[in-house]
Regions:
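Conserved N-terminal beta-strand and adjoining loop/helix that marks the start
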Residues: 1-12
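Short secondary-structure boundary/capping segments
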Residues: 3-4, 19, 72, 92-95
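Short connector loops at helix/strand junctions that flank enzyme active sites
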Residues: 6, 24, 58, 73-78
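Active-site-adjacent beta-strand/loop module that shapes the phosphate/pyrophosphate-binding cleft
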Residues: 9, 65-90, 102, 124
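Conserved Nudix-box catalytic region and its N-terminal flanking loop in Nudix hydrolases
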Residues: 10-50
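A short coil-to-beta-strand element that immediately follows conserved catalytic motifs
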Residues: 55-65
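NUDIX/MutT-family hydrolases
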Residues: 82, 91-125
Length: 130
């Protein structure tokens, strides 16, 4: 589960620490895994609070896409959500996972940990805003 916090044409990305075992030293959307019994939105809300200390405002999410990334035992199914409203200013609350957070204009996103996610994100945001 990953979330694209979106405001005024920009998306918040997290830079994965160079010490991370999986996908080190790359930009990514914040998020993580679902716990047993959690819905996608519950997992998204929990992960964004744990990593950024934000609280998603009810009704402010739109599903962007699902895609498979990686191979073999590293394969994961990503579900990406657009979040357009939240409480509290995002802060790096997980410095052991991310060494930086930064807003990027949608048209200038850097390469993401999962390459297809960046393409899907730009397409989905364009469709969402149309």
């Amino acid at each position: 589960m990953v979330g694209a916090l979106f405001r005024t044409g920009q998306v918040l990305l997290v830079h994965r620490s160079p010490d991370r075992a999986a996908y080190p030293d790359v930009w990514d959307l914040p998020g993580g895994h679902r716990e047993p019994g959690e819905s996608e939105l519950d997992a998204l809300a929990r992960e964004l609070h744990e990593e950024l200390k934000v609280r998603i405002v009810a009704g402010s999410t739109s599903h962007l896409c699902r895609l498979d990334a990686g191979r073999g035992p590293d394969r994961v199914r990503l579900s990406a959500w657009l979040v357009s409203d939240w409480r509290h200013e995002p802060t790096n609350a997980a410095p052991e996972e991310h060494d930086e957070i930064r807003w990027f204009p949608v048209a200038e996103l850097p390469p993401l940990a999962h390459g297809l996610l960046g393409i899907a994100l730009m397409d989905a945001i364009g469709t969402h805003l149309a």
